């Protein structure tokens, strides 16, 4: 019964068409990361500058497209590299995310969490967003999330 009521897709994210935009209550994944460009004609050739920019790095693309797939109030839960939250070059994407969603939670996961199973030492975060298109003012945590601040160690 549920397969007739709920959409379940197991295909490349870039292949998901506009027909499913705004249909999901939840988008969850341990997303790929890196500076790999994605070709998604609707994003690469579209009028939205943030969407065009997102196609230049696969992790940013997943966040922007993931939000597009959600219904209003839907949740996005992604495990991602720390670069999404930390890198100054990702500030425009974080700003876009905070303009289109509420920051529900941002958790820094323990170092080496995936080293045994995935063979990677990359630091990871769990980011949970709730879609809210056209929201007004960002709260204090959302404002902090969009900023990159250098911290001296030692």
What kind of region is each of these model predictions?
Residues 13-16, 112-116:
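A short acidic, often aromatic-flanked loop/helix-cap motif at beta-alpha or helix-coil junctions
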Residues 34-38, 86-88, 115-118, 136-139:
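Switch/connector loops and helix/strand junctions flanking conserved nucleotide-binding motifs
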Residues 2-3, 99:
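Short, structured coil segments at secondary-structure junctions
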């Amino acid at each position: 019964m549920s397969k007739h009521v709920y959409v379940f897709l197991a295909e490349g994210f870039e292949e998901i068409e506009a027909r499913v935009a705004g249909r999901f209550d939840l988008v969850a994944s341990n997303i790929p990361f890196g500076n790999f460009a994605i070709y998604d004609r609707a994003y690469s050739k579209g009028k939205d500058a943030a969407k065009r920019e997102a196609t230049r790095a696969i992790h940013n693309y997943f966040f922007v497209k993931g939000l597009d797939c959600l219904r209003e109030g839907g949740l996005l839960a992604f495990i991602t590299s720390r670069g999404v939250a930390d890198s100054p070059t990702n500030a425009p994407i974080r700003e876009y995310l905070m303009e289109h969603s509420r920051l529900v939670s941002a958790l820094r996961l323990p170092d080496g969490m995936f080293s045994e199973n995935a063979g990677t030492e990359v630091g990871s975060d769990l980011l949970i967003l709730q879609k809210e298109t056209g929201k007004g003012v960002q709260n204090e945590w959302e404002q902090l999330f969009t900023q990159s601040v250098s911290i001296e160690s030692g």
